[in-house]
Amino acid sequence: MSFDIKWENLTVDNTINESIQSFLDEQFKKLSLPSYISNLSVTDFQLGEIPPEITIRHIGDPFDEFYEDTTDSPETEQPKEEYTGDDDDDDDDDEDDESDDDGPGLSTISEGIHLLNFNRTGSPLPDATPLSPRPMNRSRDSFQSILHPFGVNIGPTGSETPTNLLNQSYFSSRRVSIKQKQPLYDENDIQLIVEFNYKGNLHMNILVNLLVNYPSPNFISLPIKLHITDIEIHSIATIAYLKKAVFLSFLCDVNDETIPEFNNSQSIEYYTKNNPIDIIKKIKIESEIGEVESNILRNVGKVERFLVEQLRNILREELAWPSWICLDMNDDDEEEEEEENPSESSSTTHVGS
């Protein structure tokens, strides 16, 4: 299955471009720069007009880690129950609780296929117990209603899902009781495992000062403008929608032959110890500089290699599992509410991982 993205809706104004530029600029400013570089800044970022190709491989419930990421908000905190003594009603409640614990946990749309058993902390997880699929009340129309506001339309069926991604031992989940998960779970929560293939015309500009430290420190400071283009990404990613927020993380390479079969704790431990994947598969960088001596040009090459490596590291640390980004859409609802009721509006800051 695949779907089309109205990419032009993302670039209708410059808000998203400016947000990404600000994020990258902040990340680069945190770097410890080598002695031959100073004043590094991201001056421009454009998503471009060419959208990525996205093919759906699997549809199911969001990873447990995403729910854990939302438990910090006050509305998700549940009051603690106090023991009031031996009472018949309490005994009945205990029996109901035990019944709930024995019930089915989270399942996926495809019977026998469960969620990836990933652990954000990188520690090995206990052996997963197969979950009985619960009745799904999401129809194709309801799925379409979730994606429609974001300009996403269901399209024709894509290529077949790789065998290793549909292996039951590969897709598994920790057992979560209905009693524990129900307060957090919503019927509109959904997660897509997708093949993300991007070969667009995204570009960004970086301005940096090249320093010549001979015959004395900072003897020459030469501004250089670098153009980064032709970025290619081809990986398996997860896109989850829950609590009016979208979670995005890249899981593994499309043709990653090193992924073990998840049939025992040893294979799970092997995977969780692996480093996050390198998201960028290809990148091109060009320097804009005047006539200079050959030794300065050699330093320009060092600057280019440094920036490319740091950009790869930033994306790997922020977007590759067990890390993810969260796009909080509650801000949009609050802005609309403020416009409708300006006298009753209040400012709230949302922070996502």
From Swiss-Prot:
GO biological process, one term: protein insertion into mitochondrial outer membrane
A molecular function GO annotation: lipid binding
Biased composition, class Acidic residues, residue ranges: 64-75, 84-103, 330-342
CDD domains: SMP_Mdm12
GO CC terms of this entry: endoplasmic reticulum membrane; ERMES complex
Subcellular location, record wording: Mitochondrion outer membrane; Endoplasmic reticulum membrane
Protein family (similarity comment): Belongs to the MDM12 family.
Domain notes: The SMP-LTD domain is a barrel-like domain that can bind various types of glycerophospholipids in its interior and mediate their transfer between two adjacent bilayers.
Name of this chain's protein: Mitochondrial distribution and morphology protein 12
Source organism of the structure: Candida tropicalis (strain ATCC MYA-3404 / T1)
Upper taxonomic lineage: Eukaryota, Fungi, Dikarya, Ascomycota, Saccharomycotina
